[in-house]
Amino acid sequence: MPSVYGARLTTFEDEEKESEYGYVRKVSGPVVIADGMNGAAMYELVRVGHDNLIGEIIRLEGDSATIQVYEETAGLMVNDPVLRTHKPLSVELGPGILGNIFDGIQRPLKTIAIRSGDVYIPRGVSVPALDKDTLWEFQPKKIGEGDLLTGGDLYATVFENSLMQHHVALPPDAMGKVTYVAPAGQYSLKDTVLELEFQGVKKSFTMLQAWPVRTPRPVSSKLAADTPLLTGQRVLDALFPSVLGGTCAIPGAFGCGKTVISQALSKYSNSDTVVYVGCGERGNEMAEVLMDFPQLTMTLPDGREESVMKRTTLVANTSNMPVAAREASIYTGITIAEYFRDMGYNVSMMADSTSRWAEALREISGRLAEMPADSGYPAYLAARLASFYERAGKVKCLGGPERTGSVTIVGAVSPPGGDFSDPVTSATLSIVQVFWGLDKKLAQRKHFPSVNWLISYSKYSTALESFYEQFDPDFINIRTKAREVLQREDDLNEIVQLVGKDALAEGDKITLETAKLLREDYLAQNAFTPYDKFCPFYKSVWMMRNIIHFYNLANQAVEKGAGMDGQKITYTLIKHRLGDLFYRLVSQKFEDPAEGEPALVAKFKKLHEDLTAGFRALEDETR
């Protein structure tokens, strides 16, 4: 063999010991079995083959290890080397995460595209997740030499962008006496900014820390969540609210609008920062997010317009990327979310979609010849889903100063054919507290968001009662009445189909008309208009109050008119005489929140008073 080939095809790297290597015995799709792996650990990261493909050990038997490889395994051969790294699959946490886009194992896609000049990720590419050469503005807190620090303490802030302050914390497993802290200035992620001494051993720290993705980051204690996650979608905020630190599932068939709801949450929710994981969905959806988000702006309380991308991190693992990395992408996303939670922020994590993640589990499980359970999914599917969702919650963070943070998980589920008895949907519903069920029939009627108000539920309504009492004491009663109207409409629909609308009692006709108002002009929302893409909570409350006020007044008028001689007040008469008020009720949604809260509340109050006056005049006329 010519020497040029000999130089290129060396089996071992010169600096590595031979004992660090195993060798490939079997390749089956993304699963590789390697021998000679004595001393390897579960979930240890390994490099497989001459291309240094990234893999993770998922089973150990004797000296052979089963490895799931996160890249395409075509071209791997028996006896190819497998290099052990002695560390678990970890993510890099530090300044520079926000506004970035990673793949499932935290490789920065933009950097790879620039370096390789290719539209696809080259195999075995090794690029650091965060740029180590960028300089960051480092501002230490009031700490000096001799001070004691413990895990989780915030010791500095870094200016990440004009929207987010990045708090630098000590890793959870570190502690000691400060022997050096860097003065304020510009530093890269390679520079030492803090040095601690503990039991005579000195340890230096940079602004960067690594954390294994399968291990939840420790917290001081878990707290009960009591603040609503305001999404800007009326049907979710008013009828089926979630909390900051809650768990939500959005199951629905194709074309029901799961991705649009996930994106609306990312754009308009009251979270401080958002981690959007595109897990096994179409690449075009991720491309759409990448095109939309940088152009989207959010208005801050001081009137500044800022790009939504400044508070967002994207983890893209589309359906044409290797299957095994889908499993890792969910863990990568939640670990990044926990990192921002530990700074005291409220974080939302969108997982779109957990079904694709479960399918990746099914494929790996099949390759390992494990006993399949329902629909071929592994028997531990529910346990894996639960261990992911339980990383959500509102917590008291480790270290000082005392602070609370939260991670809210919103998982989209794509059951085949919209069948909610699918194992992934069933397992998810037994875990999550909020269920936003999407309905294909509503989507076909172009009613968006297509959340079915008869099957959806939220178990957080009681936890949020104190918030609602403070915001508006009437809201809980109004919401109960609105739900009753929608339920009553569903009961009446069968009767209407049999005998027609005219045969109904006047009260039932009013119920049907109010339900139509609620359905078409309150629950339906147009995400592509400036006035309706985002609905503040005060607007949601006032719109519902006026619709229910109309319902109550109309019922009272009909009841009063029923027992009197002369002309009765009927539903037809109400609609004929008060047509202009009815039109104003329908048009409430067109009020633009950009006008400001005082202007909108004044308009809604005026309509409330006009409704009362209109019905009073109608009753006086018909006496």
From Swiss-Prot:
To which protein family does this belong?
Answer: Belongs to the ATPase alpha/beta chains family.
Residue intervals passing through the bilayer:
none
Which Gene3D superfamilies does its entry note? 2.40.30.20, 2.40.50.100, Bovine Mitochondrial F1-atpase, Atp Synthase Beta Chain, Chain D, domain 3 (1.10.1140.10), P-loop containing nucleotide triphosphate hydrolases (3.40.50.300)
- Its protein name is V-type proton ATPase catalytic subunit A
What class does this enzyme belong to in the EC scheme?
translocase
Q: What are the entry keywords?
A: ATP-binding, Hydrogen ion transport, Ion transport, Nucleotide-binding, Translocase, Transport
User: Which GO annotations describe the biological process of this protein?
Assistant: ATP metabolic process
**Species, as recorded:** Citrus unshiu (Satsuma mandarin)
Q: InterPro entries, from UniProt? A: ATP-synt_VA_C, ATP-synth_a_Xtn, ATP_synth_asu-like_sf, ATPase_a/bsu_AS, ATPase_F1/V1/A1_a/bsu_N, ATPase_F1/V1/A1_a/bsu_N_sf, ATPase_F1/V1/A1_a/bsu_nucl-bd, ATPase_F1/V1_b/a_C
Can you name one GO molecular function term for this protein?
ATP hydrolysis activity
The record's listing under SUPFAM superfamilies reads:
C-terminal domain of alpha and beta subunits of F1 ATP synthase, N-terminal domain of alpha and beta subunits of F1 ATP synthase, P-loop containing nucleoside triphosphate hydrolases
Oligomeric form and interacting partners: V-ATPase is a heteromultimeric enzyme composed of a peripheral catalytic V1 complex (main components: subunits A, B, C, D, E, and F) attached to an integral membrane V0 proton pore complex (main component: the proteolipid protein).
Q: What is the role of this chain?
A: Catalytic subunit of the peripheral V1 complex of vacuolar ATPase. V-ATPase vacuolar ATPase is responsible for acidifying a variety of intracellular compartments in eukaryotic cells.
List its EC numbers. Answer: 7.1.2.2
Instruction: Identify the residues that bind ATP.
Output: 252-259
Sorted alphabetically, the Gene Ontology cellular component annotations on this record are: plant-type vacuole; proton-transporting V-type ATPase, V1 domain
The answer to whether UniProt assigns keyword ATP-binding to this entry is yes
| Reactions catalysed, as given in the entry | ATP + H2O + 4 H(+)(in) = ADP + phosphate + 5 H(+)(out)
